[in-house]
Swiss-Prot record:
InterPro entries: ADH_Drosophila-type (IPR002425), NAD(P)-bd_dom_sf (IPR036291), Sc_DH/Rdtase_CS (IPR020904), SDR_fam (IPR002347). It comes from the Eukaryota. It catalyses: a primary alcohol + NAD(+) = an aldehyde + NADH + H(+); a secondary alcohol + NAD(+) = a ketone + NADH + H(+). GO terms for cellular component: cytoplasm. The active site is at Y151. Its EC number is 1.1.1.1. One of its GO terms (biological process) is alcohol metabolic process. Keywords: NAD, Oxidoreductase. This is Alcohol dehydrogenase. Belongs to the short-chain dehydrogenases/reductases (SDR) family. NAD(+) binds at residues 10-33.
């Protein structure tokens, strides 16, 4: 998918990886970039507008933990203005295994609910045009950081959901792929809580090993968007973009 002249909704587009990705997206010249985020950062929005004045950058406050009906109402407003939306990026995430319910609500349920809400406008069974979903998951969905099992499990769930979305594309007209960053130097990673405090220094320990910058991650994110491969499981790690081949251990045969 060429980003130029497209309409994009980016959930959590002002976070660590999110903001750098938003910068790279506007450089590529979409028609509209609509950012939905809990963070109200007028300075960042102004910066994005200045990077490419031809791009219309809009911000709406949004918490992914709200009910689907509230998300649908917000999307109705956005679709009324834009008429069409080409890409939804679900990027909300927290890393704090002390907050069990909220971790699951933000990292998994929020992704499911936002995607479910946009299907009202995209699903070809309802006369919709289809669309593309890019879900930010994590390499911990492949192999857990066992000291943060709640976070890791929430990302594995988001990855599984995304894989299923891709398989449903012939029915819904909506394609999907996952973005799975490795350890990226963001405020999220510097200090966070392990489950039951099993490892108080887990953030420090991770940063003792090779990492990537948010810019490296963002640049590869844009490459993944442009590749637009339904069902792709993209690993964005150490400045590299790698298509992961998923090993099938079981099949439902339906």
């Amino acid at each position: 998918m060429a980003i130029a002249n497209k309409n994009i909704i980016f959930v959590a587009g002002l976070g660590g990886i999110g903001l750098d990705t938003s910068r790279e997206i506007v450089k590529s010249g979409p028609k509209n970039l609509v950012i939905l985020d809990r963070i109200d950062n007028p300075t960042a929005i102004a910066e994005l507008k200045a990077i490419n004045p031809k791009v219309t950058v809009t911000f709406y406050p949004y918490d992914v933990t709200v009910p689907v009906a509230e998300t649908t109402k917000l999307l109705k407003t956005i679709f009324a203005q834009l008429k069409t939306v080409d890409l939804l990026i679900n990027g909300a995430g927290i890393l704090d295994d002390h907050q069990i319910e909220r971790t699951i609500a933000v990292n998994f349920t929020g992704t499911v609910n936002t995607t479910t809400a946009i299907m009202e406008f995209w699903d070809k069974r309802k006369g919709g045009p289809g669309g593309v979903v890019a879900n930010i998951c994590s390499v911990t969905g492949f192999n857990a950081i066992y000291q943060v099992p709640v976070y890791s499990a929430s990302k594995a769930a988001a990855l599984s959901f995304t894989n299923s979305l891709a398989r449903l594309a012939p029915i819904t007209g909506v394609t999907a792929y996952s973005i799975n960053p490795g350890i990226t130097r963001t405020p999220l990673v510097h200090k966070f809580n392990s489950w039951l405090d099993v490892e108080p220094r887990v953030g420090e320990l991770l940063l003792e090993h090779p990492t990537q910058t948010t810019l490296e991650c963002a640049q590869n994110f844009v490459k993944a968007i442009e590749a637009n491969k339904n069902g792709a499981i993209w690993q964005l790690d150490l400045g590299q973009l790698i298509a992961v081949e998923w090993t099938k251990h079981w099949d439902s045969h339906i």
